[in-house]
Amino acid sequence: MAEEDAEKAFFQAQTMNAESVDYKAVEEHGADSSDSDDYDPSKTLQDQYSSSMTDLKQSENVSSSASPEPNPTEQNSVQPDHDPSQPDGASYPSQTPPRDESRTSTMVPTSGTSVQPKTRTIGGFVVEDEDEDDAGDADYEPPAVLGVEDMNTVATNVPQQSVSGNENEASSTPDVSLDDAAQQSASLNNVSHNSYSPAPAVAPKSDVAVAAGQSLYNSHALQSGNVQDSATATPTPDSPSTSKGRLPHDRVGILEDRIQEDPRGDIPAWLELINEHRSRNRFDSARDVFERFLKVFPFAAEQWVAYAKMESELNDLYRLEQIFNRTLLTIPDVQLWSVYLDYVRRRNPLTTDTTGQARRIISSAYELAFQHIGVDKDSGSIWSDYVQFIKSGPGNVGGSGWQDQQKMDLLRKAYQKAICVPTQAVNTLWKEYDQFEMGLNKLTGRKFLQEQSPAYMTARSSYTELQNITRDLIRTTLPRLPPVPGSDGDIEFTQQVDIWKRWIKWEKGDPLVLKEEDPAAFKGRVVYVYKQALMALRFLPEMWFDAAEFCFLNDLESEGNEFLKQGMEANPESCLLAFKRADRLEITSESEQDPIKRGAKVREPYDKLLDALYDLIAKARTREAQDVARLEETFAKMNADNPPAKTDDDDDDQSESKARESVKNAQIDAVRKAHAIQIGILSKTISFAWIALMRAMRRIQGKGKPGETPGSRQVFADARKRGRITSDVYIASALIEYHCYKDPAATKIFERGAKLFPDDENFALEYLKHLIDINDIINARAVFEMTVRKLASNPDNVHKTKPIFAFLHEYESRYGDLVQVINLENRMRELFPEDPTLEQFAHRYSAPTFDPTAVRPIISPSQMRPKAVFPTSEQPMSRHGTPTPRYPGSVTDSPKRPLEDFDDDYNRPRKFVRAESPLKTSQRRQLDQQKRSQLSNVQTGSQFRSQGSPAPLPRDIVHLLSIIPPASAYTAGRFSPEKLVDLIRRIEMPSSISQIPLPQSARGLGTTQTPMQPFSGKASPSLSVRAVY
């Protein structure tokens, strides 16, 4: 059957090719008019091409209207949406048709039947005809590149290869679904590459720009731009859309299915599909994929650059100019502007410029570029190119002619602008500027350099700081959806977001000192960084919100509204952006007298948000069905491959089948529960979006009147009609009716909600609060009993009754009867036995900020006695800032080697007793003099010290003295030693203390120690000495 279908498709393609190609008409278009050499590409930025863009959009809609079908071999015809009678040249009514389009205008089939791909069969499978793909490779000539050489060499006598080009386009291989043939036939009116030489067999490596930021994606997802890499199959997700109806070698169909399933998340599929079409020289299909990709990612500058380079290589200058018109003024990207500047210099060669018109055009293009990307930290190369461009102009620097003076002024102006911008070339440009000024006149040069030096120093230091901030930044324009916390790539994504935020914060800190001198430049730099960040963080609503908020706070109303508009287009499901946009519209439309018009304007963001959220729920339902179908298919295949072993015992066979069935059901239940959680979150989000819209309409239109103004009641009715709402919508509507209008409809709404949400404890709690607010205690108790009994009847819902019990218990404790309170506590104790009784009892008398039952008043000062701190041997306390006490050594030191000074006795090295070394006469005299001075100091320092050498203090006392903080640490009252001594005198000590022997460690080294005597009211000398110390 497959062979018959393939043969039928082959003969149909042959018939269509023979009928649709008019060779005579192709030859007659060989002498078409050439392009004008006086064309000014810089002026195209101001043109809108309204009519041509409309026709282009129509052709794009035709090419994108076809959707992939499950079976690529079943299709009879595709009817294009455009009128076949309309000539192709009408696509650009305001412009002269380019040569390539005029040559292909006669090739459009007159019938709506699509050209079937030329195929053949091998072994019963449909395969591609490699001979057709390789046709014309020997005659291939590389297209012109963007540059300054050979800029007027756009050939006017290009060989007519449109027929072969169409054959190459039509003879598509079977790995392209038949929708691609429909797209090709529908887009033939825009064919422009066929008039060029035979298309290359291998696309250049710069086909699709692959940013450094692609490491954020899966490792298997993004390959290099080389076509050889694109020939390798990329692992695709196992889904029914790709596993059914697609042959394994149908790469285009598989990639289309991946894009259709996840257009915003599967960027690698987009890039591979573009490479696939370009590698097969299907440039119309590649254009179609580019356009679809850029509708989803309109600020992906890397792909705009790849798109522009493709058109440049094909010499399709009109399409290239259209790309520049669509991107340059809205996408501030250095690489994109570099491509534009190269194109301008290509179309305006300086070698043949006798009038100076080309130089003026190029100069105006540079000025326009600096207005949009001149502040970029990577724009140093463009500044350097501009300086070199000025140097190449007529005139000599330092001459006396008017051209010389003009060149000197232009160079000085360019240098002074460039050295103020923190770029990678700021140091090089400053050195060149220094040589330039000093080469003209040293006196005036020093003056100019001195004036510009502060700006240069600021720019240089700022660039260093900026490089430190952005060292790990991956500056890509291919945005990624934020990973869910805990999933793959969330840490890397968070790091990138933090770097962007630090960059923005750095710009807001005004490091270039522009806020006071040039506030417009300061705001422009911050907005520029926001735009750069939003290229990479397109799907992060918080960043759009911050950018818009900055604009609103700095009188940039139009920029802020544009940020919100673009943010909502990128994130239609973001409540943050929709609410902010609605608030701005509500504030700015206060002058509108008609509440209906004002309400319609404010409601627009809410409607878009709700549509996106409902669409997400539909997709979640579809994904759930696909996951369940995949599980069932997997288990069915497993049962078919490994059926249960047949045994004599039927019970064993049934038990094995039941086990497999139970495993399948468990997995299906897990999948459904996971999707139910996601759908529940979406339903909650939808409900709060309706609530926000309801409150906004209440502010603008009130509660509404039937037939006149919708108001909040109409929003409530719309929410109920559309469904997927939670009890929060009923609660909000009822409370609006009560608090704003005191309308009895609030109670009716609660009654209606109680029937719809009988198991919702939050709704029951709000219902109780409302009934108590209106002083309807009888109905409140009735609702309480009804709700509690219904929830308690199900053991799984018992925990839901706790907040309801707690609320009524609090109310009864304050305003009810004690018997009711005790009964409630008994019921709570039965339902929640794990809760302590003390907590329930204390709840009666406590408030959210104070619990009197937990207070312990201070009755005696003994309750506030501080704890004694005892240092442990494992971790001695720190003594930083405390002076270490020094005591006169009792052992004679040798002047030849002083005794080691230890702060304490811990870990003191063990010493061996050695004989004293003999001292010389001078050393002995010095030692005797030192002893006499120490003795006199001790005797004069304290009148309480006894004669003779004092005994060393015990180790514990030394340690205690060492850990006492210094006097400066005491900020309260000072320590009074007199009062301490007086306290010690009044202490009554037992008379038997003299019987206690002294510990061995407390005994002195001498024999003059006397036993301790009973306290007689007089302080002993040793005690007095220690107290004074």
UniProtKB/Swiss-Prot annotation:
UniProt feature, compositional bias: Basic and acidic residues: 21-32, 894-908
Listed GO biological process terms: mRNA 3'-end processing; RNA 3'-end processing
Database matches in SMART domains: HAT
UniProt-annotated stretches for the region Disordered: 1-177, 225-251, 634-664, 853-951, 996-1023
Keyword Cytoplasm: yes
Composition-biased stretches (Polar residues): 43-79, 104-119, 153-175, 932-949, 1006-1023
Record-level GO cellular component terms: cytoplasm; nucleus
The protein, known as: mRNA 3'-end-processing protein rna14
